[in-house]
């Protein structure tokens, strides 16, 4: 039967060291156009999400990750130990399923970049063309990963620097030159526009995109066990991450909002739209470089998608190891890839992609539904995380843990309740149609989102109810937790949501 090897961890991770291995989550270039649709109030939304949601998630997850015996297994272990195995299975399943849907807006971004490079608008506008191209890209990337993940982290590292970091800094630099030149700005930036118009509920829907940009921090919480002084350094690391996310996302989103009017922003190709306008203003003689930058962005997001294909399935593998999934899901190929889990996830992505692209028109509505669906699925896992933490505080205060939220029981409960209420607010708002979706499309938006969500919501509970868990999945596989000392090169350039939490050891070979 598969086993989990406990590994000793040197307590030598500093504040800056923890920040460095988590910082990849603050770069979300493909979300900048969505941020930009809220104008200057995007800064308000980033602050709101950071203070009321990101910090509570990080603090609650860190305390749960340092409870004796809970150090490995992530949200599955935390929720299982507080709410029971059914809910633990559901929580990790929602993390697995949100990745399946989260691939869709990333693929839309890829197609937006390709349409600019190839000068082929149908690739970003025609639903059938868009569907076929996205499916080809998705499964082609998957095939590259079935051969093993030996080079995945290195590819992610190159993609992060060349395809995400470099274009982001070029975007910001061009926007600064544009602003300094006195060119017209598409938004007003003052105290009045800092706050969104709360009388228009549709303007608040964009908040889900900001919550999505903060999601995944709980995946790095296990590394708190490696910190030399977690009580002092971890809260500071969370603040640094929040400040970095707010600064980078604000500047990136505003770079687009200043140049492209909100009602003209294409959510899939908005970054390329902006580069075109900026380059034609700053250096029209080298406007051809927009296609080069688009190619860099394309490669960056392709590398990101490729690196996300196997990691979450390896995380889900722990449930197959505990026989919470049928034995077929515990099967590995010779390269240490849980093929059944990976293929199942990609089938879900493909079905959702076909439905959303062709019923949503393949335009901004498809992008927004995919984004909102990703968020509401993932929020279900966070509901359980916060409720599990409240149970831990109220019923198990005696359990030893390395990190405690400072301030005692009252502060702990306030932090968890604030995070839970913010999650509930984001969940409700997600089902409201945005302002840029009008007429009959609003009904279609809500219907597609609600039906899709209910189907995904039911999957883990149906599977748990019908599967006979009496047998044992005999896989001959050992799981070795990954930490800051034994991680493969480039591992920490992956977004925390996409990282495999452990090595797969088969026949004395580590994958």
Swiss-Prot record:
Keywords: Amino-acid transport, Antiport, Cell inner membrane, Cell membrane, Membrane, Transmembrane, Transmembrane helix, Transport, Virulence. Signal peptide: none annotated. One of its GO terms (cellular component) is plasma membrane. The keyword DNA-binding does not apply. Residues 36-41, 115-127, 179-200, 261-291, 357-366, 434-445 are periplasmic. GO terms for biological process: amino acid transport. Residues 1-14, 63-93, 149-157, 222-239, 313-335, 388-412, 467-511 are cytoplasmic. It comes from the Bacteria. Shows pH-dependent activity. The glutamate analog L-trans-pyrrolidine-2,4-dicarboxylic acid (L-PDC) blocks the uptake of glutamate by selective inhibition. The keyword Cell membrane applies. The chain crosses the membrane at residues 15-35, 42-62, 94-114, 128-148, 158-178, 201-221, 240-260, 292-312, 336-356, 367-387, 413-433, 446-466. It is a multi-pass membrane protein. Its main location: membrane. GO terms for molecular function: antiporter activity. It is found in: Cell inner membrane. Involved in glutaminase-dependent acid resistance. Exchanges extracellular glutamate (Glu) for intracellular gamma-aminobutyric acid (GABA) under acidic conditions. The ability to survive the extremely acidic conditions of the stomach is essential for successful colonization of the host by commensal and pathogenic bacteria. Belongs to the amino acid-polyamine-organocation (APC) superfamily. Glutamate:GABA antiporter (GGA) (TC 2.A.3.7) family. NCBIfam families: 2A0307_GadC. This is Glutamate/gamma-aminobutyrate antiporter. It comes from Escherichia coli O157:H7.
């Amino acid at each position: 039967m598969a086993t989990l090897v406990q590994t000793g961890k040197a307590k030598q991770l500093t504040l800056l060291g923890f920040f460095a291995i988590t910082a990849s989550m603050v770069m979300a270039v493909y979300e900048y156009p969505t941020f930009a649709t809220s104008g200057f109030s995007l800064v308000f939304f980033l602050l709101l999400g950071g203070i009321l949601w990101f910090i509570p998630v990080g603090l609650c997850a860190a305390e749960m990750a340092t409870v004796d015996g809970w150090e490995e297994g992530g949200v599955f272990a935390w929720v299982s130990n507080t709410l029971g195995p059914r809910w633990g299975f559901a929580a990790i399943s929602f993390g697995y399923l949100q990745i399946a849907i989260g691939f869709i807006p990333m693929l839309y971004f890829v197609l937006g970049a390709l349409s600019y490079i190839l000068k082929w608008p149908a690739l970003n506008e025609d639903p059938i063309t868009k569907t076929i191209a996205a499916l080809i890209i998705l499964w082609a990337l998957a095939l590259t990963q079935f051969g093993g993940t030996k080079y995945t982290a290195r590819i992610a590292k190159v993609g992060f620097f060349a395809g995400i970091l470099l274009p982001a800094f070029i975007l910001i630099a061009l926007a600064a030159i544009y602003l300094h030149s006195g060119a017209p700005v598409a938004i007003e930036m003052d105290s009045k526009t800092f706050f969104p118009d709360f009388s228009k509920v549709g303007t608040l829907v964009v908040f889900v995109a900001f919550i999505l940009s903060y999601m995944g921090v709980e995946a790095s919480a296990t590394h708190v066990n490696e910190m030399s002084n977690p009580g002092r350094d971890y809260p500071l690391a969370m603040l640094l991450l929040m400040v970095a996310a707010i600064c980078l996302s604000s500047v990136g989103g505003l770079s687009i909002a200043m140049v492209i009017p909100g009602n003209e922003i294409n959510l899939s190709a908005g970054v390329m739209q902006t580069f075109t306008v900026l380059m034609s203003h700053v250096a029209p003689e080298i406007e051809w470089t927009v296609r080069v930058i688009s190619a860099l962005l394309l490669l960056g997001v392709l590398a990101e998608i490729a690196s996300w294909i196997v990691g979450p399935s390896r995380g889900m593998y722990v449930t197959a190891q505990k026989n919470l999934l049928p034995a077929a899901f515990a099967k590995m190929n010779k390269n240490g890839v849980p093929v059944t889990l990976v293929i199942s996830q990609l089938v879900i992505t493909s079905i959702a992609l076909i439905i959303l692209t062709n019923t949503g028109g393949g335009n901004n509505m498809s992008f927004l539904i995919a984004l909102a669906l990703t968020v509401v699925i993932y929020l279900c896992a966070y509901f359980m995380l916060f409720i599990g933490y409240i149970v831990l505080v109220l019923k198990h205060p005696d359990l030893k843990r390395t990190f405690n939220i400072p301030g005692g029981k009252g502060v702990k409960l306030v932090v968890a309740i604030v995070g839970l209420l913010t999650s509930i607010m984001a969940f409700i708002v997600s089902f409201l149609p945005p302002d840029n979706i009008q007429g009959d499309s609003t009904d279609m938006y809500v219907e597609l989102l609600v039906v899709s969500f209910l189907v995904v919501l039911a999957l883990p509970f149906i599977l748990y109810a019908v599967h006979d868990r009496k047998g044992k999945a005999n896989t001959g596989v050992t799981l070795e937790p990954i930490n800051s000392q034994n991680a493969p090169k480039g591992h920490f350039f992956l977004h925390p949501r996409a990282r495999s939490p452990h090595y797969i050891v088969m026949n004395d070979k580590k994958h």
